[in-house]
């Protein structure tokens, strides 16, 4: 029996809700739009029209794959972050709302920053968002992964941003360091190996481990390194911003204090969890 686009969307939303998916409304819309080759506006406009059996089958196959664990962002190859449409692949993490809070904080606190550095850029979501919100600033972004940088540069071009992307291993120490940044931001790997057991299977099986995990015996390795690096790269009065593992808020702030940063703060995210640490140089 033929089904309208709107009823197809409602049916998919109900299936996702029944599966316990909190963001069922958003995910149903994205899957139906992608599966039927319609924009959100076109889906709303054509809601009363009938979908062809081929399109309905395509949408339901996408839903099946999602219910088996494949994230929507990887199914459709894109995800929205801070109002920007980003290409996404399994080479990068799926941008999350907590990270958008980090961008918003930087924009609010450092609107006059002229040079910003994003370490571990992944899809480029932080760097590109900052570039778009702070048009007078110059943004640089680093990642160790060639594949991630390819995605980031693609997003940079598509969104007509001006971020300078470099392949760089932040744990290495093989380049000249000149104080030149007003802001350094990083959302580095921070999930311990032990915490794997607490993670959703769709994250473990699909998202890149290189961007997620750190060894149990050295869970703050990136924060220690970037704090020291920031002391060399930040201009006087510059600011350092971290997204963190909620279990290590106080410890991360202590690292900054031990590296002579001032006014270290631990900030909770929209879910009430310690998620951001920031301090002044």
List PLM regions with ranges.
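N-terminal auxiliary segments of SAM/dcSAM-dependent transferases
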Residues: 2-76
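SAM-dependent Rossmann-like transferase core, predominantly class I methyltransferases
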Residues: 45, 51, 57-135, 139-151, ...
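Residues at secondary-structure transition points
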Residues: 3, 26, 50, 54, ...
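A general structural signal for well-ordered alpha-helical segments in protein cores
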Residues: 9, 28-29, 59-60, 69-72, ...
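S-adenosylmethionine
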Residues: 133-281
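A short acidic, helix-capping loop that chelates divalent metal ions and anchors anionic groups
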Residues: 42-43, 85, 211-214
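Generic recognition of well-ordered alpha-helical segments
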Residues: 14, 61, 101-104, 154, ...
């Amino acid at each position: 029996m033929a089904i309208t686009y709107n009823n197809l969307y409602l049916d998919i939303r109900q299936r996702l809700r029944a599966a316990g998916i909190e963001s069922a409304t958003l995910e149903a819309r994205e899957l139906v739009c992608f599966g039927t080759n319609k924009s959100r506006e076109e889906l709303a406009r054509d809601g009363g029209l009938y979908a062809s059996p081929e399109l309905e089958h395509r949408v339901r196959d996408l839903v099946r794959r999602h219910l088996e664990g494949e994230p929507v962002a990887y199914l459709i190859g894109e995800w929205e972050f801070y109002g920007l449409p980003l290409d996404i692949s399994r080479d990068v993490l799926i941008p999350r709302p907590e990270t958008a809070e980090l961008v918003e904080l930087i924009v609010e606190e450092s609107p006059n920053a002229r040079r910003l550095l994003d370490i571990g850029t992944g899809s480029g979501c932080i760097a590109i968002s900052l570039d778009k919100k702070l048009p007078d600033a110059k943004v640089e972004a680093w990642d160790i992964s060639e594949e991630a940088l390819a995605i980031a540069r693609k997003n940079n071009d598509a969104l007509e941003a001006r971020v300078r992307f470099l392949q760089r291993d932040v744990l290495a120490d093989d380049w000249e360091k000149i104080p030149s940044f007003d802001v350094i931001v990083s959302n580095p790997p921070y999930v311990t190996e032990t915490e794997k057991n607490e993670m959703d299977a769709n994250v473990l099986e699909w998202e890149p481990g290189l961007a997620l995990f750190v060894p149990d015996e050295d869970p703050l390795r990136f924060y220690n390194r970037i704090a020291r690096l920031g002391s060399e790269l930040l201009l006087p009065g510059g600011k350092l911003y971290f997204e963190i593992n909620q279990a290590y808020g106080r410890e991360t702030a202590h690292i900054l204090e031990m590296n002579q940063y001032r006014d270290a703060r631990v900030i909770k995210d929209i879910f009430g969890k310690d998620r951001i640490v920031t301090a002044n140089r």
